[in-house]
């Protein structure tokens, strides 16, 4: 199914140079197109341009961006995806006003996470992390930076880094 997004205030990520990789200072160059439209076909971008040059397109769903910005995907530059178990209860506790110290007294916090990570195999950490990666990809994340930090020992930090390498090797 085709989707036409029209009236885009700023279409971000336009690069017609054909570069496959951007590094160093070139990362500061972000191509943008003002007052734009974008046509997709399935999960592929088919065409784009300025509203002044929007051709007549039939048989597609139309979405009016109403002047909003459109990014090719979400870039999450700070994640700790490699950890064992779940920290959802800690998140709820924080929302409900508990302090970090109170959460730690209840068995949560970084020390609890470090203990669980230490006791979990690399294969299991990879499996859990890939579930998280697949979930964020399904929600529109196209680029993610994965940080270590839950290991607290050299051995466990290296374990996290090996899992991160596996994720990098097996993810889109």
Feature annotation, model-predicted:
Residues 1, 58-60, 66, 139-142, ...:
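Short coil/turn connectors at secondary-structure junctions
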Residues 1-56:
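N-terminal metal-binding scaffold of metallo-dependent hydrolase/deaminase domains
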Residues 2, 72-74, 143:
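Hydrophobic "anchor" residues on beta-strands that sit immediately upstream
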Residues 8, 38, 43, 67, ...:
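Divalent metal-coordination and catalytic microenvironments
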Residues 12-13, 82, 151:
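Short, acidic Gly/Pro/Ser/Thr-rich loop/turn segments
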Residues 60, 65-127:
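Metal-associated gating/positioning segment near the N- to mid-region
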Residues 86-94, 116-172:
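Active-site loop-helix segments enriched in His/Asp/Glu that coordinate
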């Amino acid at each position: 199914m085709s989707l036409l997004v029209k009236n885009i205030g700023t279409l971000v990520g336009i690069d017609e140079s054909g570069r496959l990789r951007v590094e160093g200072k070139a990362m500061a160059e972000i191509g943008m197109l003002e007052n734009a439209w974008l046509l997709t076909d399935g999960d592929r971008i088919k065409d784009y341009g300025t509203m002044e040059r929007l051709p007549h397109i039939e048989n597609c769903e139309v979405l009016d961006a109403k002047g909003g910005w459109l990014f090719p995907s979400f870039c999450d530059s700070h994640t700790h995806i490699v950890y064992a178990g779940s920290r959802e209860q800690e998140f709820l506790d924080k929302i409900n006003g508990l302090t970090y110290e109170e959460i730690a007294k209840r068995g949560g916090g970084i020390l609890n996470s470090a203990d669980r990570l230490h006791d979990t195999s690399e294969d299991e950490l990879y499996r859990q992390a890939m579930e998280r990666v697949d979930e964020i990809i399904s929600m529109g994340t196209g680029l993610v930076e994965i940080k270590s930090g839950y290991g607290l020992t050299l051995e466990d930090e290296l374990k996290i880094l090996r899992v991160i390498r596996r994720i990098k090797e097996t993810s889109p």
